[in-house]
Amino acid sequence: MNSALLSRLSQDLALLSSGLQLANILKVTQMTTLSPKQSNRFIIFIVLTLSLSLRSAALPAEPLSADVLIVGAGLSGLSAAYHLKKAGKTALILEMSPHIGGRIRTASYPDGAHAEVGLEEFWENNPAIEIFKDLKIPMETAYSSFSSFYYQGKLYPFIQDSNPEFLRSVLDTDELQAYKRWDAKMAELYRQLQQRPLPDELLTLMETSFADWIKNTSGLSPKAQELVRIETEPEYATSWQKISALDGIAEWHYFSGNGLAPRHVIGGNQRAAQALARFIGKDRIRLNQLVTHIKSTVSGEEVTATDQGNFKQQIFRAKYVVTAIPLFRLNDIQFTPELSAERKQAIQTQSAGAYFTAHVRVDNNAARSFWTYNGKSVLPIMTDSPLGVIYEGESKPGGDALLNLLVSGADAERFNSRMSDPDQIQETLLTAFDKQWPGFRQAVKQMSFYRYHPRAVASWPVGRSRFDELSDSLRKPQGRVYFAGDFTEDTHSNGASQSALRVVKDILQKSD
């Protein structure tokens, strides 16, 4: 039975119902003691009321807000909206915060300096790079995947032109040969990760930690093992004891061989989010909208959102919904029908990595010598201390220097917990600076702290993996509801972009 016939039948039933109601009312009127004039007025009132009711019943369903509703205006949500617009589909983004960009955040200061608060870089294999090229967003590459690092109190500066040259300055001949054999093995294992289903010998690596696997099977020297730990832990923002060997293989891909180059948006990564928003249309992005309900109906998807400013609820409708938020945020949403047991388990058993950021303004003349080697900056530096990774922010010539500390793991969790006051955190950082660079605290003028949600990036505990069946369940739609965001793929912004491509491809195939 087609939709037109159903609509006509619905209207006829409404007319029949209204007619019966009117007949009953007339009978009742005749039985009352109302005067003829009063009866006529009463009948006219009832007829008008039924007429309005009939008109309302015959109206079509409320129009769609868009072809696709996207929950979350981070990189994944913005990328999905970009691809949908390119394909001629309409999208509306609902974002719970007043901010566009998710973890993409750039802080600026009165003296013109700026530094990243959130996402520091985009790896060169990130699909978002192609979007940025299309939108003519200027980018720069200032360093390699490896960085200068401290090991047993000694700085190993990255002043070479490539990862292999840097490694030759860190490891002796025997250590380097063992490293090359191990790295070649890791590259082969990474290629096997592209197979579906994964070989059983790979799946068993979920049951051991990355740290134990390296210690027991790699053949790497203690120094080389520490190199792997120090360089990779800031990527997944937790201890290598807390992720599986299987996920460790995926993480090492960014460093293997010649490594991948990280990219940065000139002027701050926030400019990329702003450019994406302009392309999508800022009228297609609703801020301060906390999504609380997603209901699947015969005619489409209904999304209820609460305005964070006035707590007014509004219902939005679309053919499809894409959630592009961290998976733990799905626990804020009531789904009808409810999420499958497998998806709930995937969400509840996922872990996460933690970040904390400190911007440190220092006297440029007094401090620059601490991070230069033969007049050349050796930043970023992996400190393996509460200082985390030290990046250099952008500052005006002749002005103060701005350092960006990206703290991860246990130190970030401690600072984020607010169990320490700002003075205590500052003293902890100054003490770490003085241990690394004696006398440095005298050059520090100001610190600004930025806290992330305790779950800053996705992680999977030993026994779980981004490659297991639970993770796969969230890469499949539940009806017309899709799950995107970096938490559905990996620990990097690559996952945000890849997930956007995944869901848009499927939506377009089903729309054709």
Give the residues covered by each predicted segment.
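Conserved flavin/dinucleotide-binding core of flavoenzymes
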Residues: 354, 370-512
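Mid-domain catalytic core of redox enzymes
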Residues: 289-406
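Glycine-rich FAD pyrophosphate-binding loop
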Residues: 86-107
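Conserved FAD-binding subdomain of flavin-dependent enzymes
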Residues: 112-142
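Bacterial N-terminal signal peptides
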Residues: 43-55
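Mobile amphipathic helical/loop "lid" adjacent to a hydrophobic cofactor/ligand pocket
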Residues: 140-241
